[in-house]
Amino acid sequence: MKKIDVKILDPRIGTEFPLPTYATIGSAGLDLRALVDEGFEVQPGETKLISTGLSIYIADPNLAAVILPRSGLGHKNGIVLGNLVGLIDSDYQGPLMVSLWNRSDKPFKIEIGDRIAQLVFVPVVQAEFNIVEEFQQTDRGNGGFGHSGKK
């Protein structure tokens, strides 16, 4: 398992709330919590930026992290990420924040310590552009959205 440096920005982590861990041996994501001063409601159509109480420094340029929504919040309550996916570069060292968007028609209550998103580490390959005049022909060519049909 890869070691990632973490700074605990909220003293409740490690006492009232655990450091994020994998729930099962097959888990890909670490749950991030709302480390706020008090509970609040996210109104329909509203977006809130929420502290997780952590910052990380990945350091390895072959890794990045993504903040993703928790499936239950989106499917059952209409709570998704305001930026859809948060990308954490390997050289970022600031606080991990979660942008939550209530796309439902009902207010949604966030309590202190609620699990609101998940952090997943992913491999990164940096690429350099090679300028060409033409591409080698493929079967797909420039077929884009819906090119392969529905069935």
Swiss-Prot record:
Q: Which domain of life is it from?
A: Bacteria
| Cofactor(s) needed | Mg(2+)
Q: Which UniProt keywords apply?
A: Hydrolase, Magnesium, Metal-binding, Nucleotide metabolism
Question: Does the entry annotate any disulfide bonds, and if so which pairs?
Answer: none
- A single GO BP: dUTP catabolic process
EC no.? Answer: 3.6.1.23
Pathway-wise, it operates in: Pyrimidine metabolism; dUMP biosynthesis; dUMP from dCTP (dUTP route): step 2/2
Q: Recorded GO terms, molecular function?
A: dUTP diphosphatase activity; magnesium ion binding
What Pfam families has UniProt attached to this entry?
dUTPase (PF00692)
Task: Kindly give the InterPro entries that the UniProt entry links to this protein.
Answer: dUTPase, dUTPase-like, dUTPase-like_sf, dUTPase_trimeric
> Catalyzes what?
dUTP + H2O = dUMP + diphosphate + H(+)
Q: Which residues bind substrate?
A: R70, S71, G72, N83, L87, I88, D89, M97
The UniProt entry's sequence similarity note says:
Belongs to the dUTPase family.
Biological role: This enzyme is involved in nucleotide metabolism: it produces dUMP, the immediate precursor of thymidine nucleotides and it decreases the intracellular concentration of dUTP so that uracil cannot be incorporated into DNA.
Could you tell me what this protein is called? Deoxyuridine 5'-triphosphate nucleotidohydrolase
Look up and give the organism this protein is from: Histophilus somni (strain 2336) (Haemophilus somnus)
List the gene name: dut
